[in-house]
């Protein structure tokens, strides 16, 4: 029997029914949030902390007066569970629901809007009634590109997160499909997980986790083991992976402001070498992390001695050039151009910077800009044969691009002309038909008039 049927049979309002029969779903068991299932949902899975949930709802005061409804707006309400984006009662109640479920919640003021209320619709210390339908839920898109989806099984402690270079101790379980291929405790440095056969998606996720947090990570190939796969674990190229990760402890690396210039320069030399090792191994995202550290440490460093300034500029120039090469490999051409711009800001005649920017712009179909960069390369080094070949490629690609555009526009104009001709033909046909009808009517009328005239004579 549904709650509505129960309410009708007993003559009680839904609010009274929940107050009498509702299940206390609070951790304190203080009857602050009572729940009755109106329609059973599908399966056994419920939303986790951080999941994006989609609901329809109706909200009423205890006297039955409606104060809000997503149905009136004809669109679902969306929020992230467990992130304090809604009242406490919702974070508690929606976490117990299954997809497709409809429930009634009765929420005491301390789990709703408290003594403040929410003027003008909700008075102070109001007990609220909600009917909620859980339409859908999905994990948190950590990087907003769909590559790492997190579902939090257990919320962490505090507000601090590991940073790049932090030492972490984690427990992990890795699965590909139904098969578990990895299960262990491991300590490593964030950004260097590859050295321990850990995919970069875990490094990225750890920077958003708190101590003792337990989560499930769904990694796309880009953040897993990529095109190379992982033969050691029997992972095929471009496989999607699932990891369950618990962050047991961590020690943050020094932030930039905690390091003096000498330490930054020393560390820059170390991470530059690490980045080069990753790059040569085809681990371009790992290399980006290392070269990026140099930029974060030195780009805004001021008050340096002449010797320090020269060393800093050398590290930054190398970092920007190497980042540009990494982004070219990762097919992130806009970022490659940005890094080349930074490098050329330090050395406007840098041959590598000009060439790599030209490469990126050629791949972005910016043929004239690319050609200009390759021509500048020849001004710096007339012996650069690769730049000459690239200029020819720019000219060829530009010609092909223009010819393709001409064909597209020619076909487009042809279709427009055919459509116009067809419309004109239809208009002409309509006019001719109209005139034919008029003439026919005119002839008939004339004949009648003639007959009448003859009759009168």
From Swiss-Prot:
Q: Provide the residue span(s) of the region labelled Disordered.
A: 1-26, 421-457
Q: What GO MF terms are annotated?
A: peptidyl-prolyl cis-trans isomerase activity
How is it regulated at the activity level? Inhibited by both FK506 and rapamycin.
N6-acetyllysine found at? 28, 155
Phosphoserine found at: 13, 445
List the subcellular locations. Answer: Cytoplasm; Nucleus
Give the InterPro entries listed for this entry: FKBP4/5/8-like, PPIase_dom_sf, PPIase_FKBP_dom, TPR-like_helical_dom_sf, TPR_rpt
PTM (free text) = Acetylation impairs ability to promote interaction between Akt/AKT1 and PHLPP1. Deacetylation by SIRT7 promotes interaction between Akt/AKT1 and PHLPP1, leading to suppress Akt/AKT1 activation. Ubiquitinated, leading to degradation in a proteasome-dependent manner. Deubiquitinated by USP49, leading to stabilization.
SMART domains with a match to the protein in the record: TPR (SM00028)
Top EC class of this enzyme: isomerase
Q: What is its main location?
A: cytoplasm
* Stretches assigned to the PPIase FKBP-type domain: 50-138, 165-251
Write down what this protein is called. Peptidyl-prolyl cis-trans isomerase FKBP5
The protein's organism comes out as Chlorocebus aethiops
């Amino acid at each position: 029997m549904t709650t509505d049927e129960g309410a009708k049979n007993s003559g009680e309002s839904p609010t009274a029914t929940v107050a009498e029969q509702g299940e206390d779903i609070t951790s304190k068991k203080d009857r602050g949030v009572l729940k009755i299932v109106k329609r059973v949902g599908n399966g056994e899975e419920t939303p986790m902390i951080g999941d994006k949930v989609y609901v329809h709802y109706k909200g009423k005061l205890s006297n039955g007066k409606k104060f809000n409804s997503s149905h009136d707006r004809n669109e679902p309400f969306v929020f992230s569970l467990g992130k304090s984006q809604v009242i406490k009662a919702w974070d508690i109640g929606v976490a117990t629901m299954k997809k497709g479920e409809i429930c009634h919640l009765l929420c005491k003021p301390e789990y709703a809007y408290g003594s403040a209320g929410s003027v003008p619709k909700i008075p102070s210390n109001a007990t609220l009634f909600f009917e909620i339908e859980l339409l859908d839920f999905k994990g948190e898109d950590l990087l907003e590109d769909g590559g790492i989806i997190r579902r939090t099984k257990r919320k962490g402690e505090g507000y601090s997160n590991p940073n790049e270079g932090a030492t972490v101790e984690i427990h992990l379980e890795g699965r590909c499909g139904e098969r578990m291929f990895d299960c262990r405790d491991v300590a490593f440095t964030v950004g260097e997980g590859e050295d321990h056969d850990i995919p970069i998606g875990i490094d990225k996720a750890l920077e958003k986790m708190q101590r003792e947090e337990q989560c499930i990570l769904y990694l796309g190939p880009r953040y897993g083991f990529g095109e190379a796969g992982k033969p050691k674990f029997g992972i095929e190229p471009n496989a999607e992976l699932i990891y369950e990760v618990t962050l047991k402890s961590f020690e943050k690396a020094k932030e930039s402001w905690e390091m003096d210039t000498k330490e930054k320069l020393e560390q820059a030399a170390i991470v530059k070498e690490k980045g080069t090792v990753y790059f040569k191994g085809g681990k371009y995202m790992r290399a980006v992390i290392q070269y990026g550290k140099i930029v974060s440490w030195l780009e805004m460093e001021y008050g340096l001695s002449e010797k320090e300034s020269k060393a800093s500029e050398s590290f930054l120039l190398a970092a920007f050039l190497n980042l540009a090469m990494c982004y070219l490999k990762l097919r992130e051409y806009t970022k490659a151009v940005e890094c080349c711009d930074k490098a050329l800001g330090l050395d406007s005649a840098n041959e590598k910077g000009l060439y790599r920017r030209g490469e990126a712009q050629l791949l972005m179909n910016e043929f004239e800009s690319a050609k200009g960069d390759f021509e500048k390369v020849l001004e710096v080094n007339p012996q650069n044969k690769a730049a000459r070949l690239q200029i020819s490629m720019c000219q060829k690609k530009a010609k092909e691009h223009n010819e393709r555009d001409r064909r597209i526009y020619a076909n487009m104009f042809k279709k427009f002309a055919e459509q116009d001709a067809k419309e004109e033909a239809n208009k002409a046909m309509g006019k001719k038909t109209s005139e034919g009808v008029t003439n026919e009517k005119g002839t008939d009328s004339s004949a009648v008039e003639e007959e009448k005239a003859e009759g009168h004579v």
